[in-house]
Amino acid sequence: EEINEIKKRDTLSKKQGGEESVKKHHEKGRLTIRERIDCLLDSKTFDELGVGAGVPVFDDNNELIDFQPANFVLGFGEVASRKVIIGGEDFTLKGGSPNPAGLRKSVYAEQLALQYKIPLVRLHKGGGGAVGGTSQNKNHRPIGEPVFNMSRFYSLAQALGVVPVVTAALGPVAGLPASRLVALFRLVLHGYVMAS
């Protein structure tokens, strides 16, 4: 039963913000975060972490009926045969504004880069805060304590001193994604801000 729920979460997570949201994204000539990651990495090297992270919604019989995935996609991959950690906001989910699981995964990216001493690649496109607040739906289970208790900027500062960090703004950014950009050297190219 638990295995089936994990598989169902994984399937729902891959739908990102839903078919309509992904379609609108494509109609504007834009790629989703998973598509961008696939374009950047060596073919078939992306090993996504935390696919099933997010907020499950259960019915009155405790059956999983919906799932809001973490809006940050994260994983290991290779660029020119070199192992990297790569991640970015999923703009198809509420414009990339962080949900609790997505925020945790975004901070975890820096921790993984430090742990494995490998480059960190960030592809930013998203807001810096959810303006709608948290859901009061009785079918949402509580998230619990954050997996990190330190300042979100602590792991960023550590990573910048230890591993190569490359950050690209691939659309509008605000809040924490924007702060990650300004923490690095910036180079403006054709209307995009890139940092390394």
Predicted ranges, named:
Residues 1-167, 172, 177, 183-195:
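Terminal-region recognition feature
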